[in-house]
Amino acid sequence: MPKSTSYAILEAIQGEMRRDKHLTLFYEYQRPAAGWSNRGINLEGEFGRTRVRFCAIDEEWIVGGALGMSMIGVPAIAHIPSMATFIPYELMFNHAGKLRHMTGGQAAFPMVLWADMARRWAFQAGQHADAGLESSYARLAGLKVVIPSNPYDAKGLMISAIRDVDPVVFCDYPVPASGPEVPDEPYMVPIGEPAVRTEGKDITIVGYAPQTAEIARAVEELKNDGISAEFIDPRTLAPLEGVMPTIIESVKKTGRLLTSDEGSYTFCNCAEIIARVAEAVPGAKFKRLAFPDAPAPGAPEML
């Protein structure tokens, strides 16, 4: 049985907490524990409440605490559930992303905002559960934003985020247990390095979690129609400097770019990708698929 994304993330944090005796996790009501096969992870049980802090439901305090610890050189992770990822936005915008620049590069702020991102689905919160804010965080200068689409990338990107000296927003969408097998030992997936999921020559498709499973199925359907699609998963949404060369070279080869984005059509992440490709590849054709500029529905009949 493959490891789940949640288990892979906790395995990454467990390994890093063993490696770094100062690393601290703040969380509220989602207990940091998971099981796989005949094994289990319970971070609070292993490391105690001094380093795995069960907090009141106050997302600003949680992120502020992690940010404050990082300011004195203690790496920290703040885990925020899906319906509350917008609450600490001001702290990330006004402090986390700016403090390195305000100190002239003399200080580092090694913190991770582990942000649950909920897909649109019907339950008690309805529209209020639509909390995919990766586009909002990606446009904040000074932050790095990563978004894994499988358990392997989730573990490797979490380790990279923890070891990074700058604040990283780790966007955690519920994704299927697919992709490469997740090793038990630690490894890093570099921030800023995209993944070419499928090679092709007729069209370039760019999309990220939680769209990747649907895109993979679409690539197979296109293959049945004689169309060879190249599928690129950015994995990093900010900064894009390391991601764009792979996408640009692909579009130079195919001449066509289709992007798929879970966010709203206007100002979505893929709009920025298209803009950069348009500047670099004259004559290429583009199409953007994204959610309409409207509040997401909460009724089951509309999902």
Indicate where each model-derived feature is located.
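Thiamine diphosphate
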Residues: 1-167, 171, ...
